[in-house]
A protein has these predicted regions:
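Well-ordered, non-membrane alpha-helical segments in soluble/globular domains
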Residues: 114, 180-184, 216-221
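C-terminal domain-boundary segment and adjacent tail
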Residues: 17-25, 53, 67-68, 210-243
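Short, small-residue-biased leader/transition segments that mark boundaries at the very start
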Residues: 1-13
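Active-site-adjacent substrate/metal-binding segments within catalytic domains
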Residues: 30-40
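Generic structural signal for well-ordered alpha-helices
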Residues: 16-18, 43, 47, 70-74, ...
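A short, acidic, amphipathic alpha-helical segment used as a generic capping/interface helix at domain edges
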Residues: 179-194
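Short, acidic/polar
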Residues: 40-47, 183-187
Length: 243
């Protein structure tokens, strides 16, 4: 399912759909990435926690987010974070039940990505600042990754296993709901069992109001402190991937 491929000078791990899902597994490094479509309730907490720990994150936003929250984008850029694309329209590229078929044409995909980079440029972000992107719903296939690559954009995604990406779930989801404590404990369990070397760890920049137990309130800070104590360094996206 997984192949090793050299990107730049770094050894990265790709999944079977050709997205980079882990950076160099021989290095005790973690990269924090954040996505948002239309919510920014985590802005103050996340910006201040990363500042406190001297960490540069990667932030991937939709076109709507850039239009709704220009001040948040400015703040992130002023702090030296990578601010990039999560697509323009948060399109669903494939049906959930069939990853091998497509709901978008290549032209629709390219138009959406061009719009995304256009709205980024208005915010002062050039292509060279953010040549990587996290696809909407973190859901893609080989064709999507190839189309992106053809535009000079490398598709990346979170390293599976820690369930950090479940921090968006809400109590009404029943069995799918994951509390912040559950997620924190799961991250530590994976660390203990196999380590988190090269992990791309995804956290949502904002979540639904129905979720009052926000991971960024308390647990994000605690997680960073614990992992630093265990000897991990937090490395920016482009440095970690060698792109």
């Amino acid at each position: 399912e997984i192949s090793l491929g050299l990107v730049g000078s770094e050894m990265c791990i790709r999944d079977r759909n050709d997205g980079i899902i882990r950076t160099d597994p021989s290095k005790k490094q973690i990269t924090l990435v954040f996505t948002a479509a239309d919510k920014a309730d985590g802005a103050d907490a996340i910006i201040s926690i990363l500042k406190k720990h001297g960490i540069k994150g990667g932030f991937f936003f939709t076109g709507e987010f850039y239009e709704l929250y220009p001040d948040v984008v400015k703040r992130l850029r002023a702090e030296g974070h990578l601010v990039g694309s999560h697509s323009y329209g948060h399109l669903l590229y494939m049906p959930w039940e069939n990853r091998d078929s497509l709901l978008v044409t290549r032209e629709q995909f390219e138009q959406d990505m061009l719009k995304s980079y256009e709205v980024m440029r208005k915010a002062g972000i050039e292509y060279k600042d953010a040549p990587v992107y996290i696809p909407p719903y973190e859901y893609y296939n080989k064709e999507i990754a190839a189309w992106a690559k053809n535009m000079g954009i490398q598709l990346i995604n979170y390293t599976p296993g820690t369930m950090s990406n479940a921090d968006y779930t809400t109590p009404d989801m029943g069995a799918k709901y994951r509390s912040s404590k559950f997620i924190y404990d799961k991250i530590m369990e994976v660390e203990k069992k196999e380590g988190l070397n090269g992990h791309l760890m995804l956290i949502h920049f904002g979540t639904d109001d129905r979720r009052t137990d926000k991971f960024y309130n308390g647990y994000l800070d605690k997680m960073i402190k614990t992992l630093k104590r265990k000897g991990y360094t937090f490395v920016p996206v482009l440095e970690a991937t060698g792109i």
